[in-house]
């Protein structure tokens, strides 16, 4: 029988990406979290702010971690608005597909951008690369260069 998530024996998909076992397009990395582009974006530049700690639901995380993730999400959102000329940055916490605390942060032009049925499930890799590069550049311009990985 497989170990449960809470026992920490079987790593989540996000833990495997963070460890480098699975590739990811990282745009932020610090001691508590990473941010990377999703492979099914609602809009170009859609990022996931992912806790390094394996916590399933955000309501189970400690307050300091939740606060840190929100601060990082705010920086990512501001960079998305700049990089993609978006009027707003949206944020969602769902957690149904991967049982590992993560926030969806994406440039938004309207309420339809919050509908996961509108996600692009087959984006061109070159488009994802370009979006990651644009977001990294905006984060560096905002003064976060020390937290922005090269890829």
Language-model segments: residues:
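HIT superfamily nucleotide-processing domains
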Residues: 1-151
């Amino acid at each position: 029988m497989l170990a449960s998530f809470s026992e920490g024996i079987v790593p989540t998909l996000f833990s495997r990406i963070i460890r480098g076992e699975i590739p990811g397009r990282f745009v932020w990395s610090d001691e508590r979290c990473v941010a990377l582009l999703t492979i099914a974006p609602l809009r170009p530049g859609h990022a996931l702010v992912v806790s390094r700690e394996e916590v399933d639901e955000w309501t189970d995380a400690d307050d300091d971690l939740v606060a840190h993730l929100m601060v990082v999400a705010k920086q990512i959102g501001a960079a998305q608005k700049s990089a993609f000329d978006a009027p707003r940055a949206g944020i969602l916490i769902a957690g149904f597909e991967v049982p590992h605390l993560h926030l969806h942060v994406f440039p938004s032009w309207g309420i339809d951008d919050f509908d996961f049925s509108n996600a692009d499930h087959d984006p061109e890799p070159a488009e994802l690369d370009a979006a990651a590069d644009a977001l990294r550049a905006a984060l560096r311009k905002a003064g976060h260069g020390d937290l922005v990985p090269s890829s």
